[in-house]
Design a protein with these regions (language model features):
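RNase H-like DDE/DDD metal-dependent nuclease/strand-transfer catalytic core used by mobile genetic elements
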Residues: 3-18, 24-136, 264-265
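Hydrophobic alpha-helical segments, especially N-terminal targeting/anchoring helices
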Residues: 22-23, 213
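Short helix-capping and hinge/turn segments at secondary-structure transitions, especially at repeat
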Residues: 121-128, 132, 143-158
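C-terminal, beta-rich DNA-binding module of retroviral/retroelements integrases
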Residues: 146-265
Length: 265
């Protein structure tokens, strides 16, 4: 898994990043275009793979900060025995039981890089023929191209057993492939997150709740894996500045600027 930064549309539209996956066993490829490489594109593209093929045993990727957090581990993470802080992507992989393997050299990324070289030739030509000039159009071309690519380059696995796991029936991927942030529950049952205030309507004894921001942008609050009822607290409009009489204000300024004796005012 990796992201390819390339002028895929050859100047006809915005710069795009191709999030690509290639299966070690069969060379099956899955990919999707995004406007940047980051946590949400990584989670969204991984979701596409899981929905199509199942949950892989491991995922091989580079040391991009999306996939490997540069931050020092928190106290909670240290108590859990982690030597490094987890990125949102690492946390999601851990919850799904997927081993994360980081590439330590350019040679270790050779397979995905060779795939990108192929796509930068073949796929770019398809995009050119379709006159794709936007993110949506590029993904439409990609959806038509990938089955043809896999039909040509896909191989039989050395072992017939598919090591992908099915998504458990009770597992909602939305609760895993999302952005999770722990927030303090205030005494008035409110939670603050990214400039918004949410009022939790359930009675809780907990001091913290988890804020889930899903890939569609929606917000969900959970506590101990239970969904919470809440409502957004409307923000109060900023107070208007006091009205000032322009005549009195000008008189006051004149006194400050020109009066040498207070009796002159």
């Amino acid at each position: 898994m990796d992201g390819s930064h390339h002028d895929w549309l050859e100047g006809r539209g915005p710069k795009l990043v191709l999030m690509g996956y290639i299966d070690d066993a069969t060379s099956t490829v899955e990919a999707r275009f995004y406007d940047h490489e980051g946590t949400v594109p990584a989670l969204d593209s991984f979701r596409s793979w899981v929905q199509r093929y199942g949950i892989p045993c491991s995922v091989y990727l580079d040391k991009h900060t999306t996939y490997r957090s540069p931050q020092t581990p928190t106290v909670e993470e240290q108590l859990q025995g982690r030597e490094q802080s987890q990125s949102q992507f690492q946390r999601a992989m851990s919850e799904l039981g997927v081993e994360v393997i980081h590439a330590h050299s350019p040679a270790a990324k050779g397979r995905i890089e060779r795939l990108f070289q192929t796509l930068q030739d073949r796929l770019v030509k398809e995009l050119r023929l379709a006159k794709a000039s936007s993110l949506a159009e590029a993904n439409q071309v990609l959806e038509r191209y990938l089955p043809l690519h896999n039909q040509r380059f896909q191989v039989e696995a050395a072992q017939p057993t598919d090591l992908h796991r099915r998504v458990p029936a009770r597992l909602d991927l939305n609760t895993v492939l999302c952005l999770k942030t722990q927030r303090r529950l205030n005494a008035d049952s409110t939670v603050q997150h990214e400039g918004h205030v949410y009022l939790v309507e359930d009675r809780l004894k907990a001091q913290t709740v988890m804020v889930h921001q899903r890939l569609d942008g929606s917000i969900h609050l959970r506590c101990h894996n239970r969904a919470l009822s809440y409502r957004l607290v409307p923000q109060r409009p900023p107070k208007a500045p006091p009205l000032v009489n322009p005549v009195l204000a000008q008189t006051f300024l004149n006194c400050l600027g020109f009066a040498r004796n207070p009796d002159d005012c």
